[in-house]
A protein has these predicted regions:
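Non-DNA-binding regulatory cores of transcription-related proteins
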Residues: 96-101, 111-134
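Domain-level recognition of soluble alpha/beta enzyme cores
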Residues: 122-149, 154-157
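A polyampholytic, Gly/Pro-enriched intrinsically disordered region
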Residues: 92-106, 148-158
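Beta-strand elements within well-structured catalytic alpha/beta cores of enzymes
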Residues: 3-7, 103-109
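Short, well-ordered beta-to-alpha junction loops that form the rim of enzyme active sites
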Residues: 53-54, 109-112
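Active-site-proximal alpha-helix that buttresses catalytic centers in soluble enzyme cores
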Residues: 2-80, 84, 125
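Short phosphate-binding loop-to-helix
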Residues: 81-97
C-alpha cells in the first residue's frame, strides 16, 4: 500500500534574487496538474499534504490538494527546504505517523532533499535524481522501513498516455 508520496515541485521560473519566491511556470502548472490527475486515478486521497515554505512548493501542493485531497489542508513544514536534513525530517515524520499510523502523506519539496528523503525512507544508496513534478510512491512503516513501489515523471506519464 502506498502511504507516502514524495514529490518535487513543478518547473519554476529561472533563478532570481529571492529563490524562495520563484513561481511555477505555465509548463510547471500543467505538469503538476497532470501528475495530480494520475494520482487521483491510481491512489487514495491523502490525509496530510506537507510542503516547504517556498512559493513553488506551496503552489505545487495546492494544485495537488485540489485534485487529490480536497478535504485535507496544506501544512507548511520548514524542514522540507532544499538543504533540509532527511534523517531529522524522518524522525519528525515517524513521530507524526504514530498519531495516525494509517495516514497517507504527500510531501512536496526540492532537489536534493527529495532524493535524500527517498533514501531515508527506503534503502541506503537509493537516492534517485528527480525531474520537476516527479514523484516517488513508497510503502512505508516505521518499524519495517519502506519500499519504493514506483516513480513517475511528467515525461514518463506523457509516454504512457499517448
Amino acid at each position: 500500500m502506498v502511504n507516502l508520496v514524495i514529490m518535487r515541485h513543478g518547473e519554476a521560473e529561472p533563478m532570481s534574487a529571492k529563490d524562495s519566491q520563484r513561481q511555477l511556470t505555465v509548463r510547471g502548472l500543467h505538469d503538476v496538474n497532470q501528475m495530480a490527475l494520475w494520482l487521483q486515478q491510481h491512489y487514495a486521497a491523502f490525509d496530510w499534504v506537507w510542503a516547504s515554505p517556498y512559493l513553488r512548493t506551496r503552489q505545487t501542493a495546492e494544485l495537488m490538494l485540489a485534485k487529490q485531497a480536497p478535504f485535507s489542508q496544506l501544512e507548511i513544514v520548514p524542514e522540507l527546504v532544499p538543504d533540509g536534513d532527511a534523517a531529522l525530517f524522518k524522525s519528525y515524520f515517524d513521530a507524526r505517523l504514530s498519531e495516525k499510523p494509517d495516514a497517507r502523506v504527500l510531501l512536496v519539496s526540492h532537489m536534493p532533499l527529495v532524493s535524500f528523503l527517498v533514501e531515508a525512507f527506503t534503502l541506503p544508496g537509493q537516492a534517485p535524481v528527480f525531474n520537476t513534478a516527479q514523484l516517488a510512491c513508497i510503502d512505508y512503516r516505521p518499524a519495517q522501513g519502506g519500499r519504493l513501489l514506483e516513480r513517475l515523471s511528467p515525461q514518463e506519464l506523457a509516454l504512457l498516455s499517448f
